[in-house]
């Protein structure tokens, strides 16, 4: 996993150039948004259990067959595995958001995910829908527009770009599952 700084250094080194111009401007922006980035990751990690359980409850409400006998989350064991997988996905999305780089998500979470789910008989459409629900909840928390009474204390300013960045990581998960 490379953070934004390491990526710029590796890129400049491979071309035998100094870091300057546009690279410095993007790093300056990354630093300026550092507190917002930390607050966004804190909002996700502090609300992880709610984000994941709401997503799983959402797919169960949308598709009641999932909780019926032979459904994807029928037994307690399957439900626990579904919640665990959701927390793992959210954790790696938060790592990627913190680093400003999706490589940790790609390398440690998404590689072979579709094949694993297929081998286990996990309904990929439902899994992708759960991730989409997590994406929406995360965007609301990051932009501090969630409707829950306890909103996260975040650094003032527009966090829509961070919500979009997190959304792109969730989209990568959805693509890997589908």
Swiss-Prot record:
<feature type="binding site" description="covalent">
    <location>
        <position position="50"/>
    </location>
    <ligand>
        <name>phycourobilin</name>
    </ligand>
</feature>
<feature type="binding site" description="covalent">
    <location>
        <position position="61"/>
    </location>
    <ligand>
        <name>phycourobilin</name>
    </ligand>
</feature>
<comment type="function">
    <text>Light-harvesting photosynthetic bile pigment-protein from the phycobiliprotein complex.</text>
</comment>
<keyword id="KW-0602">Photosynthesis</keyword>
<keyword id="KW-0472">Membrane</keyword>
<dbReference type="Pfam" id="PF00502">
    <property type="entry name" value="Phycobilisome"/>
</dbReference>
<dbReference type="GO" id="GO:0031676">
    <property type="term" value="C:plasma membrane-derived thylakoid membrane"/>
</dbReference>
<dbReference type="InterPro" id="IPR012128">
    <property type="entry name" value="Phycobilisome_asu/bsu"/>
</dbReference>
<feature type="binding site" description="covalent">
    <location>
        <position position="82"/>
    </location>
    <ligand>
        <name>(2R,3E)-phycoerythrobilin 1</name>
    </ligand>
</feature>
<keyword id="KW-0605">Phycobilisome</keyword>
<keyword id="KW-0089">Bile pigment</keyword>
<protein>
    <recommendedName>
        <fullName>C-phycoerythrin class 2 subunit beta</fullName>
    </recommendedName>
</protein>
<keyword id="KW-0813">Transport</keyword>
<dbReference type="GO" id="GO:0030089">
    <property type="term" value="C:phycobilisome"/>
</dbReference>
<dbReference type="GO" id="GO:0015979">
    <property type="term" value="P:photosynthesis"/>
</dbReference>
<keyword id="KW-0157">Chromophore</keyword>
<feature type="binding site" description="covalent">
    <location>
        <position position="159"/>
    </location>
    <ligand>
        <name>(2R,3E)-phycoerythrobilin 2</name>
    </ligand>
</feature>
<comment type="subunit">
    <text>Heterodimer of an alpha and a beta chain.</text>
</comment>
<dbReference type="InterPro" id="IPR009050">
    <property type="entry name" value="Globin-like_sf"/>
</dbReference>
<keyword id="KW-0793">Thylakoid</keyword>
<keyword id="KW-0042">Antenna complex</keyword>
<dbReference type="InterPro" id="IPR038719">
    <property type="entry name" value="Phycobilisome_asu/bsu_sf"/>
</dbReference>
<keyword id="KW-0249">Electron transport</keyword>
<comment type="similarity">
    <text>Belongs to the phycobiliprotein family.</text>
</comment>
